[in-house]
Design a protein with these regions (language model features):
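A glycine-rich phosphate-binding loop feature that marks nucleotide/adenosyl-phosphate handling sites
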Residues: 184-185, 221-228, 330-333, 361-362, ...
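Long hydrophobic segments that form regular secondary structure
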Residues: 249-266, 271-281, 285-292, 301, ...
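Flexible, glycine/charged-enriched surface loops at secondary-structure junctions
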Residues: 215-218, 320-325, 454-460, 517-521, ...
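A cross-kingdom feature strongest in bacterial/archaeal respiratory oxidoreductases
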Residues: 2, 42, 47, 342, ...
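A generic structural motif
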Residues: 350-362, 409-419, 513-529, 578-589, ...
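Active-site phosphate/pyrophosphate-binding segments
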Residues: 306, 424-550, 667
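N-terminal export/assembly segments and adjacent metallocofactor-ligating motifs
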Residues: 2-9, 13-36, 44, 48, ...
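A short, glycine/Asx- and small/polar-enriched loop/turn
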Residues: 53-58
């Protein structure tokens, strides 16, 4: 006797029965949602919980009472009183028949297919397939298309589920894949034989239920059952995406997403997916080195190196005072590493430490607060204002949330230095040179202040009073004020703006006047955590910009390279001019070998235990997933040894858990900021726009070979507005000579209508642009 559904049904629920089990499910839900909720297995290929329904594989056919034929569970809404059978003879026969059709053209590649052992088709075929095929005709063969360095194709294996097509269209927003042809002659491809360029494209590997799309750098390296999955997080932006490191014998062979709805859902950016290649590089530091009396760097034991560094730092402190010691820390450092390094410097009498290596203006001492509206809620926003933000490339999975909000009807406006290529539409985009962004934001803030009757603080009062408000500014302010759950995203470029403190004050005033959440993107992967444990200047201390402008006698650089700073030339001068330079990091590049008096090799995020804080303030602790190379050690162990060698009592610990206990309270405590703002000094000439390319963001990414072979990792160039391009006497395909008044370089020049008049777009992160002045500087451009 079948179970009877309850009559006490809520208005938004319906009573159904699945395989004799009564249940209540929401109106409008599909049958497959009900079976999944009841943990009743129904085979499927085209269905994916995050993708639009297609119902084209027909594998999920089920038997519904009174229905004339089996129906697809993924595309059939439940109805009151519906009785569904997933294991009836009709349902099972239908599923077996569909399985037979799907296998007709599928090659017997399992022994050499990278998907073997984790293949959905394999798994379902074991339960629903025939042991011997009845098909004796010639199988279909499809030529493979080269779609770039990240994704390998074996399209003869494709079963036309279209998951990849729907992902690229609906999630990535690029529509780079589609089906061509009819029936079994259908082929999935890029239409014109081009590379997949989306920053999220690698996710089609995960959604593909067969081995048609696989990880190209991982190809033929290992079988699924040889790998150990280690939980970790992404460390190339401040989201902290959850992921698994798949390792074999301590080596990371691939990276895949780990589900976390609050952060990355079940997606992963290509930067996080493929950056593990950078762990193995020709310049990886694998043993301690110290500079001998002959001026040459030579290998040393850890005991010798620690004593050498301790003596060198103590010598500078005794001769010149603690203020002549400084540290520059890459924002990928863990909270434990940052805390111990800050303690080490304080023990030496120094407050000169910073992780904000690309920040020009830090007079308000802002070190990155957590989001006022959580990451997961951004997709529910009614209006979004982007200020100096390109979330699509800077934080790809934040860009995905913004796109979801737009698809739900949110209005998106922007105040940006470049007309970035978004995968959503903007209602109003004010694209102006960096200094003019202050005027634009002041005008929007004035419109909001006037409408809300909010008083401007003294730090921005003059800017609000003198702002020239146009109708477009009023409309932008009104959209924020009228919308529910409006969000202002203060992006990477805004944080690195030459007058970031003033821009931030205007943005906060606008957010206050419109009841909008102010969400600022912290510097790097762990900027919030590092700020909370003290990796910012103490009272009277110097930040990164000051350290580079006024070099100290002793400099400690932690994972930091010249391309990670606001101006490579200044960084090189600071480390070469120091009497004692200690590099503690993973890569002993030529620049490090030229200037460092000591090199102490340490592990990167996948190789160490550490704690990190993301934009929502979520504290995430990870364990080492990969083996440390050579004699490299975890950073906290190196600092403990240094602290002991210097005789500091606070380094009397043996376990990392003891350090975590010391910092646990601080990780939940925001860093107070000041209300000081910079006084803008407008330069002359074309204003430099210095954004950070997606695949040049840090030292690990720059060494990931597959990422560097993608279209997003293009060569350095100067892009000018077409009018400025002609005025400078430049020609298509030619080069430009760019000067900042002190240094000059030659770069390929292009005319780009996305660049505003009066500006020159030259990206950071390239060795070729190292000499130029930083963001917001005035440049002179002529034909080369």
């Amino acid at each position: 006797m079948s179970a009877q559904p309850s009559n006490n049904t809520a208005p938004d629920l319906v009573n159904i029965e699945v395989d004799g089990v009564a249940m209540q499910v929401p109106k409008g839900a599909m049958i497959i949602h009900a079976t999944d909720k009841a943990r009743i297995p129904v085979p499927r290929f085209c269905y994916h919980e995050k993708l639009p329904i297609a119902a084209n594989c027909r594998m999920c056919l089920v038997d519904v009472e009174k229905a004339p034929k089996p129906v697809p569970a993924c595309a059939t809404p439940v109805m009151e009183g519906m009785k569904i059978r997933t294991r009836s003879e009709r349902a099972l026969n239908s599923q077996r028949n569909v399985m037979e059709f799907l296998l007709i053209n599928h090659p017997l590649d399992c022994p050499v297919c990278d998907q073997g052992g984790e293949c959905e088709l394999q798994d379902v075929a074991m339960g629903y397939g025939r042991s011997v095929s009845r098909f004796v005709e010639r199988k279909r063969v499809v030529a493979d298309e080269d779609i770039g360095p990240l994704i390998a194709t074996d399209m003869t294996r494709c079963i036309h589920c279209t998951r990849c097509v729907r992902f690229m269209s609906e999630i990535a927003g690029t529509s780079e894949l589609g089906g061509i042809g009819r029936g079994e002659a259908t082929e999935i491809g890029t239409y014109i034989g081009k590379s997949i360029e989306s920053e999220l494209g690698g996710n089609i590997i995960d959604v593909c239920p067969v081995g048609a799309l696989t990880n190209k750098p991982f190809r033929f390296k290992a079988r699924a059952w040889e790998l150990i999955a280690r939980e970790s997080i992404g460390y190339h932006d401040a989201l902290g995406s959850n992921l698994f490191l798949h390792t074999r014998r301590g080596e990371v062979l691939r990276t895949v997403p780990r589900d976390n709805e609050a952060i990355n859902e079940n997606w992963l950016s290509d930067r996080d997916r493929y950056s593990h290649e950078g762990l193995v590089a020709s310049d990886r530091a694998t043993q301690p080195m110290i500079r001998g009396v002959d001026g040459e760097l030579k290998p040393a034991s850890w005991e010798e190196a620690i004593r050498f560094v301790a003596d060198g730092l103590k010598r500078v402190e005794q001769a010149h005072g603690g203020d002549q010691i400084a540290a520059l820390v890459a924002p990928m450092a863990s909270c434990e590493e940052g805390f111990l390094l800050a303690e080490l410097l304080r023990g030496l009498g120094s407050r000169n430490i910073d992780h904000r290596l690309r920040v020009v203006d830090a007079v308000d001492r802002n070190a990155g607060a957590t989001f006022e509206r959580p990451l997961a809620d951004i997709e529910k926003a009614g209006a979004i204002l982007l200020v100096g933000s390109n979330p699509r490339l800077d934080q790809p999975l934040l860009g995905h949330r913004v796109r979801k909000a737009w698809k739900r009807g949110a209005t998106i406006d922007a105040v940006n230095p470049v007309g970035f290529d978004f995968h959503f539409e903007t209602r109003a985009a004010r694209v102006v040179e960096p200094w003019a962004m202050l005027d634009e934001l002041a005008a929007i803030a004035k419109a909001a202040v006037d409408a809300a009757g909010v008083a401007a603080g003294p730090e921005v009062a003059d800017w609000i009073a003198n702002a020239k408000v146009e109708e477009v500014h009023r409309a932008m302010a009104k959209r924020l004020a009228d919308a529910s759950n409006s969000v202002l995203l203060f992006g990477d470029f805004a944080v690195q703006h030459p007058a970031a403190s003033l821009l931030r004050a205007l943005a906060r005033l606008l957010a206050k006047a419109t009841n909008t959440a102010f969400n600022e993107l912290a510097s790097g992967a762990n900027g919030i955590g590092l700020a909370r444990v003290g990796v910012v200047p103490g009272e009277g201390g110097a930040g990164a910009a000051q350290i580079l402008a006024q070099p100290r006698k002793a400099l400690v650089t932690w994972h930091a390279g010249s391309q990670d700073t606001l101006r490579s030339k200044s960084y090189d001068a600071a480390r070469s001019g120091a009497d004692f330079h200690v590099y503690i990091g993973a890569y002993a590049c030529n620049g490090v070998k030229r200037t460092a008096h000591a090199v102490l090799p340490i592990g990167l995020v996948p190789e160490i235990d550490g704690t990190y804080v993301n934009v929502d303030g979520i504290v995430q602790t990870v364990a080492a997933g990969a083996k440390l190379p050579g004699e490299a050690r975890a950073g906290w162990r190196v600092l403990r040894a240094l602290g002991e060698a210097l005789g500091f009592s606070q380094f009397d610990f043996t376990e990392l858990t003891e350090v975590r206990a010391r910092i646990s309270d601080r990780l939940a405590t925001p860093v107070p900021a000041a209300t000081d703002v910079a006084t803008p000094k407008m330069p002359t000439g074309l204003i430099r726009i210095a954004t950070v390319p997606a695949y040049k963001s840090d030292a690990v990414v720059r060494r990931a070979a597959a990422l560097q072979a993608t279209p997003l990792a293009h060569a350095p160039q100067i892009a000018l507005n077409p009018a400025d391009f002609l005025a400078a006497g430049l020609s298509a395909g030619g080069k430009a000579r760019v000067s900042d008044g002190t240094d000059s370089i030659e770069l390929p020049a292009v005319a780009d209508a996305r660049v505003p008049a009066g500006a020159a777009w030259i990206e950071l992160g390239h060795a070729e642009t190292a000499l130029l002045a930083p963001n917001g500087a005035g440049l002179t451009v002529t034909g080369a």
